Amino acid sequence: MSRRHKAEKREINPDPKFGDLVITKFMNAVMLHGKKSVAESIVYGALDVIEAKAKSEPVALFHQALDNVAPHIEVRSRRVGGATYQVPVDVRPERRQALAIRWLINAARGRNETTMIDRLSGELLDAANNRGSAVKKREDTHRMAEANRAFSHYRW
């Protein structure tokens, strides 16, 4: 293990429109090439579309989508005596959130609507209703962990 000190967590400010830290993290993950204003317009545009389509509070629906995508358990590789085992481990809360955000954005980018706003709003609505690619990714992760439950005694 490294004896150096860990990098300090950076302070992030809540987003200006909703005052939500998670939306800011989501925005930062959507951002490409440092273009924050573009990412901001994409995320806010998607939340506006969600509000129009679902006729409900977009922030609550956003958090519901994140909760539905976040994995509770995942597998990690562990080498034991020449064999590599996929060992199921619990996911820390910070990692759960980071994975959920990453999976939602990747699933949205893989959709075939025309604009990113439409793709993101569609994926968020699907995830809030337990459908879509991001939820499928979470199910696959859980299925993998369940299949390798026999190796759970190799936990570290």
UniProtKB/Swiss-Prot annotation:
Keywords: Ribonucleoprotein, Ribosomal protein, RNA-binding, rRNA-binding, tRNA-binding
Matching InterPro entries: Ribosomal_uS7 (IPR000235), Ribosomal_uS7_bac/org-type (IPR005717), Ribosomal_uS7_CS (IPR020606), Ribosomal_uS7_dom (IPR023798), Ribosomal_uS7_dom_sf (IPR036823)
Highest taxon of source: Bacteria
A GO term, aspect molecular function: structural constituent of ribosome
GO biological process: translation
GO cellular component terms given for this protein: small ribosomal subunit
HAMAP family: Ribosomal_uS7_B
Purpose: One of the primary rRNA binding proteins, it binds directly to 16S rRNA where it nucleates assembly of the head domain of the 30S subunit. Is located at the subunit interface close to the decoding center, probably blocks exit of the E-site tRNA.
Oligomer and partners: Part of the 30S ribosomal subunit. Contacts proteins S9 and S11.
Family: Belongs to the universal ribosomal protein uS7 family.
Protein name per UniProt: Small ribosomal subunit protein uS7
